[in-house]
A protein has these predicted regions:
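Glycine-rich nucleotide phosphate-binding loop and flanking beta-alpha elements
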Residues: 107
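Non-catalytic, conserved peripheral segments adjacent to functional cores
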Residues: 1-97, 110, 114-150
């Protein structure tokens, strides 16, 4: 069996005259990509301005699951031993992609809009995460944050 790689899937947005509803994890079956994975901790991170970089950080054991609930962000996940194994995802409140990062990948994000809020799910408690967390220079693998014109 090959090691899991980072991936994203689009979450359905339901909208009516009252507003929007976006299910993040509808049930445990959505976590079947990682047998035994349980979300132990949920938290949010907010960036005040566009262009703020959060990352890179790396976990050997911890899974992370992310979704943007306000604003927009570019996510980057890569294998520090093989940085060419790079995965880039865009998520926003308008098109909420759930981004899943398995252990062994350095990951981070840059806000593309002011007031961006990221909801995070983790397979580790806060205490477990402290011993498994390695911070890295956001430019250790070059400028992977800039949005390029097409």
């Amino acid at each position: 069996m090959s090691e899991p790689k980072p991936f994203a899937y689009e979450s359905k947005v339901s909208s009516d005259d009252r507003g929007v509803f976006v299910p993040w994890l509808k049930d445990a079956h959505e976590l079947e990509f990682a047998p035994g994975l349980a979300i132990k901790r949920i938290y949010y991170v907010a960036n005040y301005g566009a262009g703020v970089i959060r990352g890179f950080h790396f976990h050997r054991k911890e899974w992370k699951v992310f979704i943007i609930c306000c604003g927009a962000a570019k996510f980057v996940a890569l294998d520090p031993q093989h940085p060419e194994d790079r995965h880039t995802f865009i998520s926003s409140a308008r098109k909420p992609n759930v981004v899943v990062v398995p252990p062994g990948y350095a990951n981070g994000w840059v806000s593309l809009e002011p007031e961006t809020i990221l909801i995070c799910g983790s397979s580790s408690s806060f205490e477990e995460s402290l011993g498994d967390d390695e911070r890295m220079d956001p430019y250790a693998f070059g400028d992977v944050w800039t949005v390029t014109g097409r």
